[in-house]
Amino acid sequence: MIVLDTDIATLLSYRKNDKLNKRIAALDKGEKLALTIITRMEMLDGRFASIKNAADQDELRVAMERFLQTERFLVSFSRLNVDNAGLTHFESLLKGKKTRKMRRTDMLIACIALAHRALLVTRNVNDYKDVHGLRIENWAD
């Protein structure tokens, strides 16, 4: 299983990174791409902010269209939630000297990827480098 971090999912949704697009297209048919519930929340939070901060009807119209596009994009992936195995990893990362300082959203994404023994694809490799056992690759740079 391959989990896409929020930065990669966002890039993929824009289809503007040729290296990433080619890497995704070259995957075996049996490879499963997934997004965590955290990535879904982060992507939709950004769209909600644009809707709430729209200064006029044109901005609101564009913000609503982008929100709907993002929703359509998100449903094309399997969704991974925090399960019992993820909770165990979460507890462990909270106790780690280096990992307890991680952003909470990154920590939760790492926990979900670990629980599913998944490869995490991210541009933010440094954010996850201290998570023992987490497989990380950058397909965009």
What kind of feature is each model-predicted range?
Residues 1, 110, 114-141:
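Acidic, PIN/NYN-like endoribonuclease modules and their adjacent C-terminal/linker elements
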Residues 47-51, 73-119:
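Active-site neighborhoods of divalent-metal-dependent phosphate/nucleic-acid chemistry enzymes
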Residues 8, 39, 86, 109, ...:
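Alpha-helix capping/helix-boundary segments
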Residues 5-6, 43, 90, 113, ...:
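Generic structural signal for small/hydrophobic residues in well-ordered secondary structure
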Residues 1-38, 49-68:
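Short, well-structured N-terminal submotif of metal-dependent ribonuclease cores
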Residues 13, 24, 47, 94, ...:
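Short, flexible helix/strand-to-coil boundary loops that buttress conserved ligand/catalytic motifs
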